[in-house]
Swiss-Prot record:
CDD domains in UniProt: TST_Repeat_1, TST_Repeat_2
Record domain Rhodanese: where: 20-127, 161-281
Pathway: tRNA modification
InterPro entries in UniProt: Rhodanese-like_dom (IPR001763), Rhodanese-like_dom_sf (IPR036873), Thiosulfate_sulfurtransferase (IPR051126), Thiosulphate_STrfase_CS (IPR001307)
UniProt name for this protein: Sulfur carrier protein TtuD
Function noted in UniProt: Required for the efficient 2-thiolation of 5-methyluridine residue at position 54 in the T loop of tRNAs, leading to 5-methyl-2-thiouridine (m(5)s(2)U or s(2)T). TtuD is a sulfur carrier protein that has a role to direct sulfur flow from cysteine desulfurases to m(5)s(2)U synthesis in vivo. It enhances the cysteine desulfurase activity of IscS and SufS, as well as the formation of thiocarboxylated TtuB (TtuB-COSH) in the presence of these desulfurases.
Gene that this sequence comes from: ttuD
Gene knockout outcome: Cells lacking this gene have a m(5)s(2)U content in tRNA that is about 40% of that of the wild-type strain. Moreover, TtuB-conjugates in the deletion mutant strain are similar to those in the wild-type strain, suggesting that TtuD is not involved in TtuB-conjugate formation.
Pfam family, one: Rhodanese
UniProt record, GO biological process: tRNA processing
Amino acid sequence: MGYAHPEVLVSTDWVQEHLEDPKVRVLEVDEDILLYDTGHIPGAQKIDWQRDFWDPVVRDFISEEEFAKLMERLGISNDTTVVLYGDKNNWWAAYAFWFFKYNGHKDVRLMNGGRQKWVEEGRPLTTEVPSYPPGRYEVPYRDESIRAYRDDVLEHIIKVKEGKGALVDVRSPQEYRGELTHMPDYPQEGALRAGHIPGAKNIPWAKAVNPDGTFKSAEELRALYEPLGITKDKDIVVYCRIAERSSHSWFVLKYLLGYPHVKNYDGSWTEWGNLVGVPIAKGEE
């Protein structure tokens, strides 16, 4: 049994075959925002996840109108096929995928294996920045069914206790146990408290990928989640520190395994670890 929605994944071969396709736009989304300038897939444009997606004043996402303007600037219309890829096994590309889906874009795909696979296969790179005619775009709706807010998570803790829901903390075991507030080898910043949301199971996001950055098989992915009670019949909320890693796990659960009710808590530990009056847990559960 394969992936529930194989159409959302494209291979490096597929991308190379569609480099001249006017109906396709390829976007690179990296943690290292300078990486694009060192060489990228021919025709690919750059998304700076912080500058392009976040409102700097309210610490939230840009509005529907601003998203539409961003799409038009990138030459994307509502019927454009958008292909996303990036570094770090596609974690920020997956975040962009989630944000495109939140804004109701119909045809969004991830390049399986991301930037790493493209480079390792010796495929072409360029430093030339492409230019496209402006697109015509209107955000059809915002899909709140895939986004969890802090109040939703507080209510969800009760569902988890009742066996009707599941929480997945996709961070490193050290962050989950409360030993660190960020990944190992990163500056320890962003939260006053360390630990995890009570009831959460720790399934690090990177367990879902192979050494070459491609996703593991559906059978392997089910074996990763189901033994810990992360099953299709439950409402599921995933989180990390600022939602890029949890977007990757959200993609796995919703699109590769076909779980119907999965939300990404984009406030994640940066919000939860700083909130007054909410519970945390430390150690293993």
